[in-house]
């Protein structure tokens, strides 16, 4: 039996009035985005010593754990670069300060982040931008191995940005190779893309929109006999990528989730009275089609507005997205926690978080961004764990990714010494996402959530002076399906 003793990074301690059986553990996705482009969240600036970069990343993960989150979404590809050891794209300038230069001493930030996140019972989702090839505020010279140098035929300039042309199959294939490599080599829990598909429009000095320069790929499509209008063709280019990403992720590892975080308004007038940017016509993102057809495992529309903004009201937009989710995938909206102190208070963020639940047909929330939570702006983290995040939660199950529960764990109990009782766990075969231990004392159940690779569990000999009456241990599969419990009752 494998005996790996993990006491550190114990993830939850929840007290409940003792019912006849243990209470169900809450299921809710609670995450934050960790943005690396422009050093928004991490690292705090480029060129830092590796030890400092690692310490900053650990501190962000500690923040997620402190505020009872269960996932982080780490940006690992900002613009056809890599914040990990990639055989396909150059190192990001946001690490070393120069694109293509590996960190010294050598380390792999994504592998490090996965290990550290999982030790804290946090899922790690790798976030990438599928088409952006060069950020407008990038400073470093372009590395020789960057796609704009190796395949300039795939890249167009638009304003101060470079973009892979979505109309070229080879552009999409390049991104798909990156996705497949990420899922294959790293023990990540999700692949995540945001709202950047075709770019947000650039404007001239007179304020008129600048056309996106895809004439070459559009002409090739027409010569091939294509019949779609140019807007429909652009939307289908994005649809093709989304479908292919979903397939690529699940082909490599069926349990890894694929998520999309589109702009929060599909089209003006949906629902009635809503105004704002038309992503369907401007970004060529048909997000309603994606959520209706279940083309991803979770959707996180960026609902960055307040309840006071009647033309973009949070509650109305949340209800609309929920009504479109006919494929019953996860709906985990993003909210603008970074706006605290500008246009909203922490109380509003807590209120928005509190709207998530069965009544709104949503089961999670993602906070933009990590820095706001780390700074505990206006006490937002404190208020969350005193309110909607008071109890720790498991990530909701994704049964369409695998509905088979793990086998009931086998346990062995040890009483050696004067320390805690130990329960050794034989969890059988397969990757596990969590181990749940529920202990019944005299008046309450205690629920603890451990990392999925935990194989030895300490159980106090007494809790508030009372020996445990019953201990139940369950395991969760990677898609979040819970096993039957192993039960120990002291004699």
Predicted features by range, described:
Residues 170, 174-178, 184-185, 189-193, ...:
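Active-site neighborhood of glycoside hydrolase catalytic domains
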Residues 284-288, 292-310, 321-400:
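Substrate-binding cleft of secreted/luminal carbohydrate-active enzymes
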Residues 461-483:
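Beta-strand-rich modules
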Residues 67-105:
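Aromatic-lined carbohydrate-binding/catalytic grooves of carbohydrate-active enzymes
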Residues 419-430:
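Conserved aromatic anchor
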Residues 55-81, 185-189, 295-296:
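Catalytic domains of carbohydrate-active enzymes, especially glycoside hydrolases
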Residues 82-97, 132-158, 195-224, 270-278:
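Aromatic- and acidic-residue-enriched segments that line the glycan-binding/catalytic groove
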Residues 27, 35-55, 126, 131-185, ...:
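Active-site-adjacent "subsite" loops/lids of carbohydrate-active enzymes
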